[in-house]
């Protein structure tokens, strides 16, 4: 989704580069990947509202409200994005890092409805409210996207804000239940399928 260190990790790319056929990324990220040993023919760079198809899967690079850069000298030198992934009959939305904005309704109108939406809901603060969504905004985003199941993401890993590590999960659930929005929060390492969404919610974070 963008080149911040918590989203584009050198060690992870080195482990993946010989195991995948394609890396899809926003414009400019390819330079990082090439330096780390990824071959040019493995890299597909896209601008907003461009797409790439392979077999029966479409990948749509879409707007988000964030920024990029891995240091003070290259801020906003590469693109940041969200993604829609369509493999009939399934449609998935991945927000990447993003503040709340009208782009979400635009995406929902053009590409929705979505079966599952993975939406940024952590590391929020009023000082940078345009870069990350509060849980209440993440639920609004899920509604704008016309999504069936909301998966809160971007919480419980890196500490970038002052809230407790599990507050995003607790608050997301609270707001989702208020509006009758289905949600699911998989445990770390859990493999999910559509059947999971009919199971009782496992509040696994309460064990820690």
Go through the PLM ranges and name each one:
Residues 9-18, 160-170, 195-196:
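Metal-dependent catalytic neighborhoods of phosphoester/phosphodiester hydrolases
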């Amino acid at each position: 989704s963008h080149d911040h260190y918590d989203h584009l990790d050198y060690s992870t790319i080195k482990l993946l580069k010989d195991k995948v056929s394609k890396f899809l990324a926003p414009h400019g990220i390819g330079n990082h990947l090439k330096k780390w040993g990824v071959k040019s023919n493995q890299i597909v760079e896209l601008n907003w509202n461009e797409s790439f198809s392979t077999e029966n899967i479409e990948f749509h690079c879409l707007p988000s409200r964030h920024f990029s850069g891995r240091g003070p000298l290259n801020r906003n030198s590469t693109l940041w994005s969200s993604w829609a992934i369509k493999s009939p009959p399934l449609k998935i939305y991945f927000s990447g890092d993003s503040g709340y904005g009208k782009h979400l309704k635009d995406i929902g109108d053009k590409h929705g409805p979505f079966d599952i939406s993975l939406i940024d809901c952590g590391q929020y603060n009023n000082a940078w409210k345009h870069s990350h969504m509060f849980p209440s905004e993440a639920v609004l985003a899920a509604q704008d996207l016309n999504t069936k199941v909301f998966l809160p993401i971007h919480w419980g890993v890196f500490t970038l804000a002052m809230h407790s590590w599990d507050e995003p999960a607790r608050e997301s659930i609270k707001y989702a239940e208020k509006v009758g929005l289905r949600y699911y929060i998989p445990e770390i390492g859990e493999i999910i399928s559509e059947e999971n969404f009919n199971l009782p919610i496992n509040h696994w974070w309460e064990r820690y």
